[in-house]
Amino acid sequence: MAAGVSLVSDLPYSTSRESNTDMETVNVRVPTAKYTKVGETLRHVIPGHMQCSMACGGRACKYENPSRWSDKEQAVKGLYSSWITDHLLAMARPSTEIVEKFNIIEQFHVCGLKTVINLQRPGEHASCGSTLEPESGFTYRPELFMEAGIYFYNFGWKDYGVASLTTILDMVKVMSFAMQEGKIAVHCHAGLGRTGVLIACFLVFTSRMSADQAILFVRAKRPNSIQTRGQLLCVREFAQFLVPLRSVFSCAEPKAHEVTLSQYLTRQRHLLHGYEARHMKNMPKIIHLICRLLLDIAENRQTVEEEVLEIPDLTEEVEKTVSLQALQQLGKEMRGKGIPISSPRSPDQPNLLGTPCDPPHDQPLCSDQEFDVLWRWPTVDNTYRSRLILSKCFSYSDSALHKLDPRVHVLQSPQNLSSKSGLNFSELYASQSRLALETPDLLPSDIKSSPKHDLLTGSRSSLVQSKKIEEQVSCPPASVKQAPLKVAKRSMSYGFLGRTNDSSTMFSICQVGRSTNKNSNCDVTQHFKDVPILTLQSELSPETRHLFVAKALTVDLDGEELRSKVSVWQMELNSREGAWERLCNERDPVVLSLLMWSWLEQLKEPVITKDDVETLSGNRLNPEHALNSLDKGQKQTLLCILDCAAHLLKIPEEVENAFFERLIKAFTWISSDSENGQLIYKALKDVMVPVLRDLRTKAMEELEFTCHCSFVP
């Protein structure tokens, strides 16, 4: 509820608690409460029926009287309502009379509103507007909406109050879930206080706006929203609450406190829900995802695409629904009130994940230069953002699961490091080139003898015809404007979350004479535009691809180039919206493997501690019993990686031994050449080798079964 109250300013709000070199902080005023402190106190002591009479007119409640509001203030005719985004409606509570008189349900269907979220408690504001329905305690019967195919949720939230942070987190996850069905309408009494808080928290959760940015954005769309000091504080505290939960790498910016595997899984459970929450209850998402991506590279999986209805992206809505004039006005207001705003990047500042040439649609506006638009993500293509919700790794509603695979398509990501980062085009695939040169048996003999064979490189982005190579060097494909799709497509590939174009592959062969001198890379780059490119998606045998991935799993983090690429991914996963989706486009198995090992090695303590080593050693004659002695998180994490290696099937013994060396090193932080290192490695291998063989046997049986089924008429 909101009454005619004066606007007052709070004490200056300082963000000195958080120092960020990329943010400007001015210790001046920020969004303030809509009520005075006296007014807030009175609202907690004055009886409800008196508040209704004094504040909003009692039975003649202005919030439930359409004649009190202009057409612009009635996004849905008959209700005091406002579109916050194209898919989020804030509204005053409806009543049975209004629903019937203004045909609200039909309007909802026309607008595409599929969910109603009610934040009231039954019996609340009984002296306001229409009388309460005895069956529900609200001014309407929820069955009116449910019988019309509109979902209904009720989260009881005390008027003028705030909910706990975990409760709000549950609410915004439900909203993320519900938005996949269609648009959402949220209401409390007036649709201002509690409704504004929830929507602001949802913006913070889904688009990584700061708390104050979200508050100002909601107020710009629905004036007088988020009313009390407690509600303002609630949004700010919720934003802070999410910071450690989103941290994947504590060693990368923005840094967070180190956590154990068990603590990380607890944090992960807060953010995940639905399919992911069930499937990764005891397994880190990053381990599960990387193992699946490695198997997709090894199997060179072809994706089977299915047409489904496009799910809207909230981040694109936020940009689209704010005009240039509104952006300028908000930018001035925020600078005037001292809200931290990202400083424009200096010309000489490297942009590790950016592209050297921004597409026309992502060029900064004149207002961006002056005010630095709040919700502009410089490294994410707008077309890519339009599918973030589609591929968002939250979960899918039950009605969508039957037609969707949880692994979905995403567009190409701008992960090619720009020249500003010190890496040129020929260095992009150096890690795979080195690995390939060290493995002469990776290529079939017929390919080795081909005059076109010379340089083996890893292809992560789409390969195009040779005439387009020069354009790729100057402007990576991720920065090219993509035409919006009317239909979104999801990948049915087992385990692959990314998008595999027809021309994309893990390898390419360039017609360049093999050279071992230092200038070979320069020659490759110099002749790229004249070199035809062959894709080896079909030429490479499965055994060759399996061996390539197996060798990638044995690599240590060494060299500035690899460190730079892994570091970029660490920061990306920590701080960027849609980073999980962009990771699915990484096709370099070396980078993926190193990212996985680096995550295990940055935890607060090893996944397998010294006590665990002793327990496993004592049970090494019974590997299954030994694994069961570990916690569920330890066991599932270890089994996930072993299962990935098992699906690579038969690999040379020396490669398998090197894999175990790298695995044990990452899980125990003990080097094989340390004191008692050899004894520890032997004891753990005695447990892991039989487990790997069992998993490999099962993988081969699955493969035989799949092959048999494929030939059944």
Curated annotation (Swiss-Prot):
Protein's UniProt keywords contain Disulfide bond: no
InterPro entries in the cross-refs: Dual-sp_phosphatase_cat-dom, Prot-tyrosine_phosphatase-like, PTP, PTPDC1_PTP, Tyr_Pase_AS, Tyr_Pase_cat, Tyr_Pase_dom, TYR_PHOSPHATASE_DUAL_dom
Residue ranges constituting the Tyrosine-protein phosphatase domain according to the UniProt record: 80-251
E.C. numbers: 3.1.3.-
Molecular function via GO: protein tyrosine phosphatase activity
Keywords: Cilium biogenesis/degradation, Hydrolase, Protein phosphatase
Pfam families noted in UniProt: DSPc (PF00782)
GO cellular component terms, semicolon-separated: cytoplasm
GO BP annotation list: cilium assembly
Active site: 188
UniProt family annotation: Belongs to the protein-tyrosine phosphatase family. Non-receptor class PTPDC1 subfamily.
Function field: May play roles in cilia formation and/or maintenance.
UniProt-recorded name of the protein: Protein tyrosine phosphatase domain-containing protein 1
Organism: Danio rerio (Zebrafish)
Lineage: Eukaryota, Metazoa, Chordata, Craniata, Vertebrata
